[in-house]
């Protein structure tokens, strides 16, 4: 119809938006659209803006503690300059700590935190913010809570000790223009309270005032809920996924594994693990047993018609080229052999009679290290790699975010996925090309 009406690209987009909104409602449509955009644009391998800090310039204003009275700031430039100084003053310390009560859509503060977190892994950031308590759109036709997650994920990946906690409120009312100073930044020697439009701020330096504000912030922080559970070691990751799989089995809910690369860890054999796990790895034998047990549970109890596994053509190619799976750090094991790579892909395809395999019909190449999602209706986690190729597992704790991912995967349109015949044809073509390429290289 859009083609018949000879609509411009912008008119076609608006027309299709209106059509889908009529079908499913505005909140559901924009929530699903927000999840899709998050997945398509996600990458924690590329830093945001490059900030070059000159200590002499940053130190122009004296913000050390012990002063009397307050310092007012007027205008966005002066407020942002004060924020930069506070962040910089803590980030250069060996054990700096920044406590912030700001919304994730404050791009200036979030980008600074990411940059300083990358520069100083010992930096601790406590972040308290408000999640929207309803499905109404706040701005730009986006789901507000998912937009918050999108802003936060790069800081999760920057390497510092980042602790994000949330509370619920009506965001529109919470940050309206009649709130005096809804935002707060706390450091060792200073506290900066500022307005939602970043036009006005007050700097506090008196120790008695700072002590009271720290106690209040810590009290609020403890009352709030953690946005995610971060798992930084192989052992904690294995323990978490094992628990999650047990919960998946116990639940009647459908389960979804959405990955760029096929979910192959459940197909690894004990022989493969014995051959490729690094010999010097601490707890090596325990890890072999744990991964083998995980594979056994996956094959005997998880891979059934309640399980849907999404993967991409690009992910198949990546696995064949590298011999590595997404779920484990590359320093823990050597790449799988040529024959093992072929065998794993064929074993994966053979699962189509037991589980639902869905190859994504990609219109554009996804990020090299994209967002992996494993969810059912009750719990789940996100998995991604940082710029330094460190694996980050984030257990999803916030219900509306969990529901958004689950609903998106449950409702993926047929036109976004290849048919089974197309899937088999494309994968076989990839395997044939891989074998042919390997044969050519071997004959050189």
Predicted regions located by residue number:
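Short amphipathic recognition helices of helix-turn-helix/homeodomain-type DNA-binding modules
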Residues: 3-56
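Short amphipathic alpha-helical patches
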Residues: 24-28, 38-43, 233-244, 429-433
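Long, charged/polar, low-complexity intrinsically disordered N-terminal extensions
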Residues: 55-67, 75, 92
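Non-catalytic regulatory/interaction regions at protein termini and inter-domain linkers
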Residues: 429-444
């Amino acid at each position: 119809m859009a083609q018949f009406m000879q609509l411009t690209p912008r008119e076609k987009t608006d027309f299709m938006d209106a059509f889908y909104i009529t079908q499913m409602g505005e909140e559901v449509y924009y929530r699903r659209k927000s999840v899709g955009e998050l997945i398509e644009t996600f990458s924690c391998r590329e830093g945001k803006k490059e900030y070059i800090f000159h200590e002499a310039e940053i130190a122009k204003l004296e913000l050390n503690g012990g002063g009397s009275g307050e310092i007012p700031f007027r205008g966005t430039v002066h407020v942002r300059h004060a924020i930069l100084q506070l962040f910089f003053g803590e980030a250069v310390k060996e054990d700096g700590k920044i406590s912030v009560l700001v919304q994730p859509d404050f791009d200036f503060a979030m980008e600074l935190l990411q940059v300083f977190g990358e520069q100083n892994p010992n930096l601790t950031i406590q972040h308290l913010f408000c999640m929207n308590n309803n499905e109404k759109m706040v701005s730009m036709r986006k789901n507000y809570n998912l937009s918050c997650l999108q802003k936060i994920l790069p800081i999760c990946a920057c390497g510092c000790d980042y602790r994000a906690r949330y509370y619920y409120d009506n965001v529109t009312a919470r940050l309206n223009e009649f709130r005096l100073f809804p935002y707060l930044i706390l450091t060792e020697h200073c506290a900066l309270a500022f307005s939602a439009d970043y036009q006005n701020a007050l700097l506090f330096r008196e120790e008695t005032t700072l002590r009271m504000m720290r106690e209040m912030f810590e009290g609020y922080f403890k009352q709030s809920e953690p946005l995610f559970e971060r798992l930084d070691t192989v052992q904690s990751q294995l323990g978490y996924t094992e628990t999650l799989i047990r919960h998946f089995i116990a639940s009647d809910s459908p389960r979804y594994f959405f990955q760029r690369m096929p979910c192959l860890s459940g197909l690894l054999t004990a022989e493969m693990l014995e051959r490729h796990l690094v010999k010097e790895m601490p707890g090596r034998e325990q890890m072999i047993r744990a991964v083998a047990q995980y594979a056994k549970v996956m094959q005997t109890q998880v891979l059934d018609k309640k399980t849907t596994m999404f993967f991409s053509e690009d992910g198949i190619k990546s696995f064949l080229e590298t011999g590595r799976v997404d779920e484990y750090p590359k320093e823990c094991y050597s790449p799988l052999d040529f024959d093992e790579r072929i065998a794993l892909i064929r074993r994966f395809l053979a699962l189509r009679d037991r589980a639902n395999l869905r190859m994504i019909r990609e219109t554009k190449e996804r990020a090299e290290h994209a967002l992996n999602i494993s969810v059912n209706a009750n719990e789940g986690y996100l998995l991604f790699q940082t710029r330094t190729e460190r694996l980050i597992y984030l257990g999803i704790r916030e219900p509306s975010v969990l529901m958004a991912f689950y609903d998106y995967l449950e409702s993926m349109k047929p036109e976004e996925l290849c048919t089974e015949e197309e899937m088999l044809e494309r994968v076989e073509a990839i395997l044939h090309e891989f074998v042919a390429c390997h044969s050519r290289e071997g004959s050189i």
